[in-house]
């Protein structure tokens, strides 16, 4: 029987645009000298940093008067969307909360907006860190102080600038559908996003960010944070890597239960479920013990929430982002099925025709597919791992050329795939690779739109277009073999190599060449006067001066024009087409339909 549940430490991810201060903020939280005392010391976990509640209350002070049952905050060390979307837990995001870092002087940038969209998709609470407040001209630094204390020390001009910049963020958030306010003015945390002006460089405002996160967890998340302390461990694999003397290891965020040395564990591999036993659990040594040769300290067990390194046999092929479960009291089959189902539950809606997507982790694959779905881009196949030769060949067989593409998120392209791409038979296939989802999608959309225009242009070029011409008086340069006459183009677009017909439908010959100002041209627009050579007729017999002639468009071309390109035709082309089809449909009402 499991003992009574306890409240675990909430897991926090830091997100935001490149260079807005995500890493600096994490570094400041990790290395804050204010809390580096023995009691309530900030401890370094594998892939995460634990800030205990004692440290938070000492930094801010305000929570000391409130009863707090959240043990602290566990920050995932890898900042950015990728960490957030990669780390899943039971179908949702592993992170319980997020900090979105925004440069208060630059405002929202594309990655900021993408972060907010991802958080909205996952229904994850977050706080805005309006960073680099110390860069505002005239700002007086008050190292590590809460925002309101440091704000009170600024002159009126600086205070006014801070207020203006905060309200610019409020306005932008409102445009994106979020209600927000400066954190000290928020009364309903469920309906308003808190904006905390801060400086990762000086530590100003940092206590407030931690306090707001604790407050959010305390008020709205105590139920979802309840775990069974002695229950079987459940976690998410951050990274799979080889360590000297240990072999293959897993960096794991444990979010439920307890994991012990000797526990049987189940984890997802590339194409199979892997069962193995925990050989050792390792924590990084504190900085004070850095001179000790061993980098890791061995522990017998670990309880959620924590970052831990797991050494075990048979870990080759484990997927980053995979769920990991401990087996207890004979529920092995149930756990295997649970892991299999969780991997299969990745929400990727596949279509018969679509792009091929690759990513380095399960969660990243799901995040990419969700964003593609939001842009109405269909996905035919979604797989974890690098881009292979098989992917390129498969993309080359996709019927719709606008989907002959592979999108690779945070994962490499193998050399055999590069070789396959160099084959002339695969020249129509493109690979888009990178570590930022919105950039990948922008690049693909730009390529697709260009390709669409090119295909339409090619289709247009192959079609015989409508034209109506009149033979001009005093412009018969040769009567036959071929007849050479001057004509005015009354409507449409005249092309070389097309057949001509009289208004009664009688075919009279084919245009061999068009000349304008003594130069051969392939086509000429309405209103122009040109000389044409016509194979077939004799002037004075089949054709005469002042005769009107139409380009005799094949029926199949008329069908394509009317169904697919009519909207792209100029008024002159449309009018001439209508005249020509009206003449044809006098005899056969269904001609060209």
UniProtKB/Swiss-Prot annotation:
Positions that bind GTP: 16-23, 77-81, 131-134
Signal peptide: none
Top-level taxon of the source organism: Archaea
Keyword GTP-binding: yes
Region (G3) residue spans: 77-80
Annotated stretches, region: G4: 131-134
Region G5, annotated ranges: 199-201
Cited InterPro entries: EFTU-type, P-loop_NTPase, Small_GTP-bd, T_Tr_GTP-bd_dom, TF_aIF-2_arc, TIF_IF2, TIF_IF2_dom3, TIF_IF2_dom3_sf
Entry annotated with the keyword Protein biosynthesis: yes
GO molecular function, one term: GTP binding
Function recorded in the entry: Function in general translation initiation by promoting the binding of the formylmethionine-tRNA to ribosomes. Seems to function along with eIF-2.
Stated name of the protein: Probable translation initiation factor IF-2
Source species: Methanoculleus marisnigri (strain ATCC 35101 / DSM 1498 / JR1)
Origin organism lineage: Archaea, Methanobacteriati, Methanobacteriota, Stenosarchaea group, Methanomicrobia
Gene responsible for this protein: infB
